[in-house]
């Protein structure tokens, strides 16, 4: 969840992150509010996805509707000290082949090799971070895979990060003029242009396009969305409101996209194309995704980190 702030895939689109200059009670209140939002959003998303499981056509999706299973976990930091933890929410259903909606709140000290890479950690390695992370892979190749995460990070500085992106798995649907692409981009733009006025949609859309790119394939992972990090406008309440708007936009648009596609029948060729496209997803997450790499190198929960990988995949 806490990624490095450097690297080829992370152009410096974030605003300058300010040094914290406030009393402890204010910082703690902000931590509490951010964590509460992430966990409430998790609950709303899980409930929405379970309704989709109930409503999916029985003829295409036989069997019982899936339900989320929650598994708590704890972590230790590099010194062995207690470092918080989280809750994995996983579902393998008749519509959602695999979906994880995870919340975590972690704290501790960054290992020496990471301190220079994190804003505010070079001289004081202590950190706190809370967030929500989601990836969904559906059985129906007509329904795109999706990823969303938002987080709040505190060192001697504090900032928000996150985003959402859509990955159609059929080439004929992987276009910017596809109805799903248009609707998803419109929803993310709406989240960025709310009255709080602290987000830059054009930058965050471009950042997403550049981040979710496989250079060895010379292709994008999906059709894009938004991606942002080190977001600190100087108005914390507005920054939280923006992050909430991203979550609400996702909660509205993705179930709509699922519903408009889940009654479409698919062929064996569609499934084959889906499995091959999932291979690209695996390649990106294991080779380039800084959250995955960082989590594996800093003692994160392996099951949670790798839950983003699809349950079945092929390479031709």
Curated annotation (Swiss-Prot):
Pathway noted in the entry: Porphyrin-containing compound metabolism; protoporphyrin-IX biosynthesis; protoporphyrinogen-IX from coproporphyrinogen-III (O2 route): step 1/1
Record-listed E.C. numbers: 1.3.3.3
Residues given in the record as a divalent metal cation binding sites: 137, 147, 185, 216
Disulfide bridges in this chain: none
Positions annotated as active site in the UniProt record: 147
Extent of the signal sequence: none
Subcellular location per the Swiss-Prot or TrEMBL entry: Cytoplasm
Domain of life: Bacteria
A single GO cellular-component term on record: cytoplasm
PROSITE patterns, alphabetized: COPROGEN_OXIDASE (PS01021)
Residue span of region Important for dimerization: 281-316
Sequence positions that bind substrate: 133, 149-151, 299-301
Keywords carried by this UniProt record: Cytoplasm, Heme biosynthesis, Metal-binding, Oxidoreductase, Porphyrin biosynthesis
Subunit structure as annotated in this protein's UniProt entry: Homodimer.
Family per similarity comment: Belongs to the aerobic coproporphyrinogen-III oxidase family.
Protein name: Oxygen-dependent coproporphyrinogen-III oxidase
């Amino acid at each position: 969840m806490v990624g490095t702030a450097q690297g080829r895939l992370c152009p410096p689109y974030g605003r300058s992150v300010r040094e914290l200059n406030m009393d402890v009670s204010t910082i703690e209140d902000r931590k509490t509010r951010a964590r509460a939002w992430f966990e409430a959003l998790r609950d709303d998303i899980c409930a929405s996805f379970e309704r989709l499981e109930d409503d999916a056509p029985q003829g295409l999706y036989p069997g019982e509707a899936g339900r989320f299973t929650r598994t708590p976990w704890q972590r230790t930091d590099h010194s062995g000290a207690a470092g918080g933890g989280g809750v994995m929410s996983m579902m393998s259903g008749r519509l959602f082949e695999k979906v994880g909606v995870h919340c975590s709140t972690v704290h501790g000290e960054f290992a020496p090799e990471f301190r220079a890479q994190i804003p505010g950690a070079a001289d004081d390695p202590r950190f706190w971070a809370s967030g929500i992370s989601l990836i969904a892979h559906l059985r129906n190749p007509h329904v795109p895979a999706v990823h969303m995460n938002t987080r709040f990070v505190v060192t001697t500085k504090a900032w928000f990060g996150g985003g959402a992106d859509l990955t159609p798995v059929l080439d004929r649907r992987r276009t910017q003029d596809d109805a799903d692409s248009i609707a998803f981009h419109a929803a993310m733009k709406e989240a960025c242009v709310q009255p709080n006025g602290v987000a830059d949609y054009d930058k965050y859309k471009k950042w997403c396009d550049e981040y979710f790119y496989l250079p060895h394939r010379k292709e994008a992972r999906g059709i894009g969305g938004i991606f942002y990090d080190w977001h600190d406008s100087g108005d914390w309440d507005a920054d939280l409101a923006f992050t909430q708007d991203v979550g609400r936009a996702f909660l509205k648009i993705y179930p709509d996209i699922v519903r408009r596609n889940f009654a479409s029948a698919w062929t064996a060729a569609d499934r084959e194309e889906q499995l091959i496209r999932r291979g690209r997803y695996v390649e990106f997450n294991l080779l380039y995704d800084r959250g995955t790499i960082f989590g594996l190198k800093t003692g994160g929960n392996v099951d949670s980190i790798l839950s983003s990988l699809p349950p079945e995949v092929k390479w031709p």
